[in-house]
């Protein structure tokens, strides 16, 4: 089975590899054709989805195989546990039988104990009678002596039987303890087996749950694949609609071309250019539609990106708020710091200004002192000069007035200087007061500065802590800024893409409007050409230019014809490849149908075997329920037997107490016996009887060692029926033991046969396909559905390409016919032109010279910019 699965897997992998190669070949063929670009993208996406589903399927198949292997292992464990439980049931049954035997033996021992009690009571009565006789003092007769001997002998036999029974009771107790221990061990093993079975059942349930989960995942993937296929079908319908639109546009172009062909030869170039513009317009419209689809997709993506960007912007906004809060805290701290620093700077500046003011005032005081000294010196000099003047007054009469004036001036200056000196003194006094006050303020400011330095140090420590926090916050801000930059880059990329697409859209719209405008211009020019047809004077120039243009168009038509032939060959090759692909797909579908039928047969067989196994499992469960009921019944019986056994033990304890009491009474009686002589005689007789009994015992021992009669135990039937019954029970038990051993051998043979059947069934189950067959069947159905869909798509594409090839053939034929018509018209026009040249050579030259200055202006292909009437 594993080899068959491996072979199937190899075949599936080879088929998948072949499909992969075919896919690559189709992609290679489609990559050269831009018109099938959209189809190629959809095809690649479908192939990616198929590959993903194939990988998921492989993974699920591997997991299913693992689960099946674990289920097989667990089923084997369950089977072994069931086998152990069956063995435990057999041991429990055998132990129950042994317990029943033990209870029977206990019952027989109880009966014997009852008989022994009765004999003990009878002996007590006889002892009482004997004591009475002894008290009466009457002599014993021979009959009484013989009775006493018989009683003593009977007493010894009873004591022997009692000892035997006690030993048997001890043995039975030991065997009962062993059986109880064995039963407990079997119950423990049974509980362990049940626990293991429950664990295995739980594991199987877990595996089944996992398998169901995997199956649900697979169904989900199948639904997704169906959705993708539906999307693909919708895209195919859209492509078909677009192709129909293109076909309609082509038909309209053909109609327009037919209308343009009906025009004259002189307007053919304009008509062809108009046709080219219309074709380009159709292409632009198609591209516009594609751009609109792309724009819609981009708008949807932009909306999604906008939502994501909005979420990111909200995160960024939140982070910015956090950053703003942190910045506010940081700014507050910085403001406080700057405020303290400003206060400190102001204090220091004020201190410096005060120092400068003090130094300046000290300098001014020194300067005033120096000025006062200079004034004094000047006063002395003036006094000396006054003396000199007074002395020389008499010498110079003319200089006296001058000197007096100078003296007045100097005196005025002196008074001024003295006033200034007084002012300076007052100012110096004020300055001393100010200096004293400033020194006080300096001391106060020094104290304030020391306090402020302490505050600054404290603030610096706080600033360091805040700076560490700010550093951490800066790290966070940097990380958030990096994330923000990434989001901004993504946003910029999306915005640039959007701008690019919008720019392309605007350019396309501008081109469309430009083309429409050019189309209107061309229509207007065509109208002008229609009006200028009557202008015969420009025919020669136009025909000459038209000839060159026709030659060029002929070359272009040849190139287009060659291109169309090449495209026709390519489409033919593509159609052949598609036909080969179709044949291959049909072959694969036939193989899949055969495989599906085979898998269906195997599935039916597996279902029938599953039903058989289910019925066997139900039967086994019923048997287990019956065994559990029997075990409960046996447990209740064991509990009852244990209680009865405890009761018997209590009875034996009571009997022991009674025996002790009897012995004590016997001792009392022996001490109370007054007649020693009789006791001696009795002792003598007892010794003689003891010798007789010893000789008898010796003879019996010799007879036992060398038995003369093998079936001597049959004599006990009359003498000792209890011993006879015991011997018969032993014989019957031996026979039953032999029969039970034979039954055990038969059961072992049956067990071996059952094990063989179990192993064969296990091998059959191992050969049968599991849930993998159903999975493979689903896979084949899905692949068959996919292939049918692909076949439909390929057939539709084939029809489309056939229609296109027919259209190309029709266009080629049409172009060849047009080329022939153009050649004919060109030759006819050439003949007419030659005839016209031969007829009107000189007049045309004169008219040409006359017309040329006032003729219409031409640009490009000879289209007139204004219409003027020409006169010949």
Curated annotation (Swiss-Prot):
> According to the UniProt record, which cysteines are disulfide-bonded?
none
Record carries keyword Coiled coil: yes
Keyword Cytoplasm set for record:
yes
GO BP terms? cilium assembly; flagellated sperm motility; Notch signaling pathway; protein localization to motile cilium; sperm axoneme assembly; sperm flagellum assembly; sperm mitochondrial sheath assembly
Give the stretches traversing the membrane.
none
State the coiled-coil residue ranges: 106-595, 642-839
Tell me where the signal peptide lies. Answer: none
State the similarity comment: Belongs to the CFAP58 family.
Q: What does this protein do?
A: Has an essential role in the assembly and organization of the sperm flagellar axoneme. Required for the elongation of the primary cilium and sperm flagellar midpiece via modulation of the Notch signaling pathway.
Q: How would you summarize the oligomeric state and partners of this protein?
A: Interacts with ODFP2.
What protein is this chain from? Cilia- and flagella-associated protein 58
Q: Which organism is it from?
A: Homo sapiens
The taxonomy runs: Eukaryota, Metazoa, Chordata, Craniata, Vertebrata
């Amino acid at each position: 089975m594993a080899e068959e699965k491996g072979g199937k897997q190899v075949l599936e992998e080879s088929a998948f590899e072949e499909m992969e190669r075919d896919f690559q070949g189709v992609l290679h063929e489609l990559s050269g054709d831009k018109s099938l670009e959209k189809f190629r993208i959809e095809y690649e996406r479908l192939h990616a989805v198929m590959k993903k589903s194939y990988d998921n399927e492989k993974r699920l198949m591997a997991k299913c195989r693992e689960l099946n292997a674990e289920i097989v292992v667990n089923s084997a464990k369950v089977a072994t546990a069931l086998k152990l439980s069956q063995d435990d049931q057999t041991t429990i049954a055998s132990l129950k039988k042994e317990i029943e035997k033990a209870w029977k033996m206990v019952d027989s021992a109880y009966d014997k104990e009852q008989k022994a009690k009765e004999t003990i009571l009878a002996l007590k009565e006889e002892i009482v009678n004997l004591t009475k006789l002894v008290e009466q003092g009457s002599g014993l007769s021979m009959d009484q002596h013989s009775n006493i001997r018989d009683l003593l002998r009977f007493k010894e036999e009873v004591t022997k039987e009692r000892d035997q029974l006690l030993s048997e009771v001890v043995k039975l107790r030991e065997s009962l303890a062993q059986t109880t221990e064995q039963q407990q061990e079997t119950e423990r093993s049974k509980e362990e087996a049940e626990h293991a079975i429950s664990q295995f059942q739980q594991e199987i349930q877990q595996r089944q749950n996992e398998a169901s989960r995997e199956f649900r995942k697979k169904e989900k993937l199948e639904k997704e694949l169906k959705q993708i296929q539906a999307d693909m079908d919708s895209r195919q319908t859209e492509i078909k609609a677009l192709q129909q639109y293109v076909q309609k546009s082509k038909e309209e172009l053909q109609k327009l071309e037919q209308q343009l062909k009906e025009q004259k030869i002189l307007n053919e170039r304009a008509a062809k250019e108009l046709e080219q513009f219309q074709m380009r317009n159709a292409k632009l419209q198609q591209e516009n539609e594609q751009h609109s689809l792309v724009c819609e997709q981009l708008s949807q993506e932009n909306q999604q990106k906008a939502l994501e960007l909005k979420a990111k912007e909200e995160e960024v906004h939140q982070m910015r708020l956090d950053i703003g809060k942190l910045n506010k805290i940081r700014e507050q701290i910085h403001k406080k710091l700057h405020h303290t620093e400003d206060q400190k700077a102001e204090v220091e500046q004020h201190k410096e200004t005060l120092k400068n003011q003090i130094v300046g005032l000290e300098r001014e005081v020194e300067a005033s002192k120096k000025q006062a000294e200079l004034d004094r010196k000047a006063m002395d000099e003036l006094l000396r000069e006054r003396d000199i003047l007074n002395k020389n007054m008499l010498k110079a009469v003319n200089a006296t007035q001058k000197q007096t004036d100078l003296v007045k001036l100097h005196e005025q200056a002196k008074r001024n200087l003295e006033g200034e000196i007084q002012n300076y003194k007052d100012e110096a006094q004020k300055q001393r007061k100010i200096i004293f006050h400033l020194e006080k303020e300096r001391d106060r400011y020094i104290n304030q500065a020391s306090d402020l330095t302490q505050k600054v140090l404290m603030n610096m420590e706080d600033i360091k802590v805040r700076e560490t926090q700010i550093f951490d916050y800066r790290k966070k801000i940097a990380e958030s800024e990096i994330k923000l930059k990434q989001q901004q880059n993504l946003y910029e990329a999306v915005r640039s893409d959007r701008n690019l697409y919008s720019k392309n859209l605007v350019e396309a719209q501008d081109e469309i409007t430009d083309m429409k405008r050019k189309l209107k211009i061309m229509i207007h020019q065509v109208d002008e050409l229609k009006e200028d047809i009557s202008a015969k004077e420009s025919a020669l120039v136009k025909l000459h230019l038209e000839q060159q243009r026709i030659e060029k168009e002929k070359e272009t038509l040849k190139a287009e014809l060659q291109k169309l032939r090449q495209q026709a060959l390519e489409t033919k090759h593509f159609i052949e490849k598609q036909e080969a692909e179709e044949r291959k797909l049909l072959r694969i579908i036939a193989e899949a149908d055969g495989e599906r039928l085979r898998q269906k047969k195997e599935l039916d067989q597996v279902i029938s075997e599953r039903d058989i196994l289910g019925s066997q499992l139900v039967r086994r469960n019923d048997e287990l329920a019956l065994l559990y009921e029997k075990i409960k019944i046996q447990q209740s019986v064991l509990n009852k037997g244990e209680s009865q056994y405890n009761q018997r033990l209590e009875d034996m304890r009571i009997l022991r107490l009674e025996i002790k009491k009897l012995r004590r009474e016997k001792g009392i009686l022996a001490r109370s016996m007054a007649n020693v002589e009789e006791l001696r005689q009795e002792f003598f007789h007892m010794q003689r009887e003891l010798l007789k009994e010893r000789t008898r015992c010796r003879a019996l021992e010799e007879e036992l060692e060398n038995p003369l009669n093998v079936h001597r135990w049959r004599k006990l039937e009359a003498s000792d029926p209890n011993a006879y019954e015991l011997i018969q029970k032993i014989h019957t038990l031996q026979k039953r033991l032999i029969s039970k051993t034979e039954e055990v051998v038969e059961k072992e043979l049956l067990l071996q046969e059952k094990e063989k059947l179990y192993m064969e069934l296990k091998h059959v189950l191992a050969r049968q396909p599991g849930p993998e067959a159903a999975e493979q069947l689903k896979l084949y159905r899905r692949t068959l559905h996919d292939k049918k869909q692909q076949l439909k798509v390929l057939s539709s594409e084939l029809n489309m390409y056939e229609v296109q090839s027919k259209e190309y053939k029709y266009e080629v034929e049409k172009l060849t016919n047009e080329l022939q018509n153009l050649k004919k018209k060109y030759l006819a026009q050439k003949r007419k032109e030659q005839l016209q040249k031969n007829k009107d050579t000189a007049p045309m030259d004169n008219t040409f010279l006359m017309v040329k200055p006032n003729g219409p202006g031409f640009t490009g292909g000879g289209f007139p910019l204004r219409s003027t009437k020409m006169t010949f």
